[in-house]
Amino acid sequence: MNEATWIEKMRAVEGTLYHVTCAMLREEYDRRDAMQETALRAWEKQSTLRREEYFGTWAVRICINVCKIGRAHV
């Protein structure tokens, strides 16, 4: 997936990812950190995405995992 496509897909799921962070994390700064970490991991691990049409589900799963790790450090 090229960079422009990846950015487009991330923007499409940004709202959903934010809602996930709101459900899992209390502090706004933790939510912003989780969003940023999710984007970074999604970029670095895009080779693990099997089919582009599952990008949203895949990104949400990454976000959930990031939030779980964040909550464990609190």
Regions found by a protein language model. Give the residues of each.
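Arg/Lys-rich amphipathic alpha helix in sigma70-family domain 2
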Residues: 50, 64-73
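A broad detector of the eukaryotic-type serine/threonine protein kinase catalytic domain
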Residues: 44-47, 74
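Structural recognition of an alpha-helix C-terminal capping motif at a helix-to-coil junction
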Residues: 19, 33-40, 44, 53-65
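A short, charge-rich alpha-helical start-of-domain segment used by transcription regulators
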Residues: 1-19, 23, 29-35, 43
